[in-house]
């Protein structure tokens, strides 16, 4: 696959072609996913749950994120690598910069930070210093204790209004991409149309500029046995993992995934 850059992703949004993203934590799956055509590999702090067996992402450290980023880099075949800043790794803008530098040196092309408009100062500082940022809004797993669990965000009109305003504010602060998780499909569509940067969705309907799933979920692997509504098992009917990865890419590109059954209403 030709090397994917931010320019590539902006071009895909401009021409209306969907962007494909999957989580990835090691060299073998990095090679498999990138060779299947997945454009963005997300080294997610979800590794705390799917690899380490924790019940949340909170125990994951920056050092662990750097380790897995370096592993993904070694297997990657042209995809853009996006790495999460883990819990409390961006408590201050300067701390965010120091930890982002660690992740970029390990092989990340961009970092992802969970939050809302209060992130503007941090995003501005990172962007000014050459660190591209993806802002993660909606259901933010690092604040699951404040949110009261893994619940859809933005169903109330006041909350939806605030999310729209926050998305615009973060773009103006320098965010290069947005990720919306567990947001009503209509709201996700409005935010996607309101900003000029790529918007990736998970449980946010089909109108976003692209889709992401946790690798283990889309391969039918689950420690807990609980499968989120927005997940589809792409291993079903496929002879091997490569075919499942290709099927995911094709489904996103053809907008046959996600279907209405994978999204949420207001």
Swiss-Prot record:
Reaction equation(s) it catalyzes: 3-methyl-2-oxobutanoate + (6R)-5,10-methylene-5,6,7,8-tetrahydrofolate + H2O = 2-dehydropantoate + (6S)-5,6,7,8-tetrahydrofolate
Pathway info: Cofactor biosynthesis; (R)-pantothenate biosynthesis; (R)-pantoate from 3-methyl-2-oxobutanoate: step 1/2
Protein name in UniProt: 3-methyl-2-oxobutanoate hydroxymethyltransferase
Signal peptide: none
Quaternary structure annotation from Swiss-Prot or TrEMBL: Homodecamer; pentamer of dimers.
Cofactor note: Binds 1 Mg(2+) ion per subunit.
Entry similarity comment: Belongs to the PanB family.
Compartment(s) where it occurs, according to its Swiss-Prot or TrEMBL record: Cytoplasm
GO molecular function: 3-methyl-2-oxobutanoate hydroxymethyltransferase activity; magnesium ion binding
Record: active site: 181 (proton acceptor)
Keywords carried by this UniProt record: Cytoplasm, Magnesium, Metal-binding, Pantothenate biosynthesis, Transferase
Binding site for Mg(2+): 45, 84, 114
Function, in words: Catalyzes the reversible reaction in which hydroxymethyl group from 5,10-methylenetetrahydrofolate is transferred onto alpha-ketoisovalerate to form ketopantoate.
């Amino acid at each position: 696959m030709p090397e994917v850059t931010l320019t590539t992703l902006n071009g895909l949004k401009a021409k209306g072609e969907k962007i494909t993203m999957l989580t990835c934590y090691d060299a073998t799956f990095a090679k498999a996913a990138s060779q299947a055509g997945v454009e963005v590999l997300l080294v997610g702090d979800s590794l705390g749950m799917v690899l380490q067996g924790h019940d949340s992402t909170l125990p994951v450290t920056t050092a662990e994120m750097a380790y897995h980023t370096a592993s993904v880099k070694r297997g990657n075949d042209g995809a853009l690598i996006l790495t999460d800043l883990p819990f409390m790794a961006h408590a201050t803008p300067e701390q965010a910069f120091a930890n982002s530098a660690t992740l970029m040196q390990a092989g990340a092309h961009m970092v992802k930070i969970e939050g809302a408009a209060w992130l503007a100062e941090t995003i501005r500082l990172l962007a000014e210093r050459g660190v591209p940022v993806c802002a993660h809004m909606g259901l933010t797993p690092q604040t699951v204790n404040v949110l009261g669990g893994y619940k859809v965000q933005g169903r109330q009109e006041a909350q939806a209004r605030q999310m729209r305003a926050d998305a615009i504010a973060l773009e103006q602060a320098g965010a290069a991409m947005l990720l919306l998780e567990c947001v009503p499909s209509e709201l996700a569509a409005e935010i996607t149309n309101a900003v000029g940067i790529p918007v990736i969705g998970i449980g946010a309907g089909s109108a976003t500029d692209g889709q992401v799933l946790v690798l283990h979920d889309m391969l039918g692997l689950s420690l807990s046995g609980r499968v989120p509504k927005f997940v589809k098992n792409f291993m079903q009917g496929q002879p091997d993992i490569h075919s499942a990865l290709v099927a995911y890419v094709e489904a996103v590109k053809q907008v046959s995934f996600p279907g209405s059954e994978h999204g949420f209403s207001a």
